[in-house]
A protein has these predicted regions:
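An anion/pyrophosphate-binding glycine-rich loop and adjacent beta-alpha core
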Residues: 1-97
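A conserved FAD-binding loop/helix module that cradles the flavin
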Residues: 181-202
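Composition- and surface-driven signal marking solvent-exposed, interaction-prone regions
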Residues: 16-17, 49, 107-108, 188-191
Length: 202
């Protein structure tokens, strides 16, 4: 969904790899952004064709999703009641609830909706099937930021999963697998193959 910074402006391709978007977020005011979506979010989420932990709907082959949409939305209702997720009947009202500049935000949404209608993201290059307008009330928004996920440090291992010492020699009786090992996510987070972290240890 659309993401805007605390100045009410879009700042990234929301469909890019986690780390690309989060590095962009890190450069924004207070390292914070707002996720924005509208009443059609269920329809849009289904057409996003997500994989892994983002998947909210069963796969075409019948495989279950990680968490179903209805379950996730029930949590959103709790967040609305708690005041974290904002719900509004107009874009102006949503901007005020998120405490971001109204004029900037409305202009950003209008520009984004134009790109969605054209089917081409001239600003950031998001794919056509993930260009979904924000034009149907009620509108929703939530402030959020980054988190640590699969950090780059860990135990260095050999092909037998033995942990190595500082000289590159195996430490007797010590083994490590999966995300506990170093270098697994040295360059990117491979969300296209959600079994990769565990599969490499089999």
């Amino acid at each position: 969904f659309l993401k805007v910074n605390l100045n009410g402006k879009r700042f990234c391709n929301e469909s890019g790899p986690y780390e690309f978007m989060l590095h962009s977020m890190e450069m924004q005011p207070y390292h914070t952004y707002c996720d924005i979506f509208d009443a059609n979010n269920k329809q849009y989420a289904e057409q996003f064709d997500e994989v892994g932990c983002c998947r909210l709907f069963p796969f075409p082959n019948g495989a279950a999703s990680n968490m179903g949409y209805d379950y996730v939305w029930s949590k959103n209702e709790e967040l609305i009641e708690a005041g974290y997720l904002q719900k509004a009947n107009t874009l102006e009202e949503l901007a005020e609830k998120l405490n971001i500049p109204v004029d900037n935000f409305v202009a950003t949404v209008n520009r984004y909706n134009e790109l969605c209608a054209a089917g081409v993201d001239e600003d950031y290059g998001k794919e056509r099937h993930r260009l979904t307008p924000v034009d149907t009330a009620p509108f929703y928004g939530i402030r959020t930021g980054a988190w640590h996920l699969t950090t780059l440090n860990g135990c260095r291992i050999n092909t037998d999963m033995q942990v190595l010492d500082t000289n590159g020699e195996p430490i007797e009786g010590l083994y490590a697998t999966g995300d506990c090992t170093g270098g697994m996510f040295a360059t990117t987070y491979p969300n296209l193959f959600t079994g990769l972290a565990c599969g490499r240890t089999m």
